[in-house]
């Protein structure tokens, strides 16, 4: 029950009329805190890791932490690589066990972005991994 695909959580939330929190986790304290709060509220949870935000933590350290914590959770938890900008990073995340990847090709032309997103979808789905694609840019900066 615990480690699930994000699209499953989204479909259930849509049918049930509720939202699923999607929180970033950069260290074990954050991850376990997010899961404990979700368990306390009996809420599903999506845990994400954004390499550009937490560049000091290698994927091979961060993603297994998220995946293993999700598997131990008492509520459904999806794990997602956020803003993967290239095929190799996406593949590494899939091999490390995440249930979802987000491909961010927003710096590419629209046509190239769609093409690469489609290629990633084929590979990811073969491994049972959900894909979110970023096909445009929202103005502003963080």
Model regions and ranges:
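Helix C-cap/helix->beta junction micro-motif
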Residues: 41, 73-75, 127
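N-terminal amphipathic alpha-helix/helix-capping segment at the start of soluble metabolic enzymes
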Residues: 1-21
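Active-site-adjacent beta->alpha loops and helix N-cap segments on the catalytic face
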Residues: 3, 32, 55-63, 83-92, ...
